[in-house]
């Protein structure tokens, strides 16, 4: 196919998987996969982590974000592994390990599209949210993709669908470390000596110091998650 109409119910009788789109940009793919979810399960959706900058949009998206969208389908990687750093290869190994652990839920669980609300009930349109629940309702994966960072933004909430109301769930997120180079010359707000952005010194420091990501760790009932939700830790807001 050179464009749309790739998915055909008749063809799915003969082949178990269809390539969703030649556009592998994670922001675009989130919308594409969101649309496919109205008619097709994740188990037939080919979804890949590709190079950054993306070949279709030239957008730079972090590896962990590209994985977060691609894992909501049949995960694959279309990267030249010989071009990746040791850190990126280690991250991919962890991603594949995580995907294998949760593959049954991600591919065969019930897929829910979630509406987002910020504080005081304000509707949040700057994020794509999904949660995928195992057939027995005991396990689930939540995915949130922030489209853009806004300054002074209020906390986001995790409000689910499909969880067992009377079950106790342990809610936690992936433990991630972030490259300090993503903060640009903000490093000079804490560095005792001037550090030029993208310099050799900047690169050397990135191998020694990494930023901790947000931490989520909650014990809560399915009823609370489905009906009220829980506030998430604040990310970078400027």
Model-derived segments and spans:
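Conserved, mostly hydrophobic/aromatic
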Residues: 70, 142, 171
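Catalytic cores of secreted or luminal carbohydrate-active enzymes
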Residues: 64-117
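C-terminal beta-sandwich/jelly-roll accessory domains of carbohydrate-active enzymes
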Residues: 148-238
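Alpha-helical protein-protein interaction modules
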Residues: 106, 110, 116-125, 154-156, ...
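Carbohydrate-binding surface patches
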Residues: 119-165
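Short, solvent-exposed polar/charged micro-motifs at secondary-structure junctions
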Residues: 5-10, 120-126, 181-182
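Glycan-recognition surfaces
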Residues: 1-83
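Active-site proximal loops enriched in glycine and acidic residues that flank catalytic Cys/His/Asp
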Residues: 1-3, 79-83, 143-146, 162, ...
């Amino acid at each position: 196919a050179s464009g749309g109409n790739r998915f055909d119910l008749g063809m799915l009788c003969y082949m178990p998987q269809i390539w969703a789109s030649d556009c592998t940009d994670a922001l675009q793919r989130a919308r594409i996969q969101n649309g496919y979810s109205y008619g097709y399960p994740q188990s037939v959706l080919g979804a890949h982590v590709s190079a950054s900058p993306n070949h279709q949009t030239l957008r730079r998206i972090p590896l962990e974000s590209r994985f977060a969208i691609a894992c909501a389908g049949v995960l694959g990687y279309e990267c030249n592994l010989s071009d990746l750093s040791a850190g990126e290869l280690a991250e991919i190994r962890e991603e594949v390990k995580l995907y294998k652990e949760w593959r049954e839920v991600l591919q065969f669980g019930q897929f829910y599209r979630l509406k987002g609300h910020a504080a005081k009930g304000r509707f949040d349109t700057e994020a794509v949210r999904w949660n995928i629940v195992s057939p027995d309702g005991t396990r689930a994966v939540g995915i949130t993709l922030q489209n853009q960072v806004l300054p002074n933004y209020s906390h986001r909430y995790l409000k689910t669908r499909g969880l067992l109301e009377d079950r106790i769930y342990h809610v936690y997120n992936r433990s991630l470390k972030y490259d300090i180079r993503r903060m640009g010359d903000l490093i000079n707000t804490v560095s005792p000596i001037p550090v030029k952005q993208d310099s050799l010194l900047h690169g050397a420091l990135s191998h020694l110091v990494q930023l901790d990501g947000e931490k989520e760790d909650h014990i809560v009932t399915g009823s609370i998650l489905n009906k009220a939700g829980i506030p998430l830790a604040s990310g970078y807001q400027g």
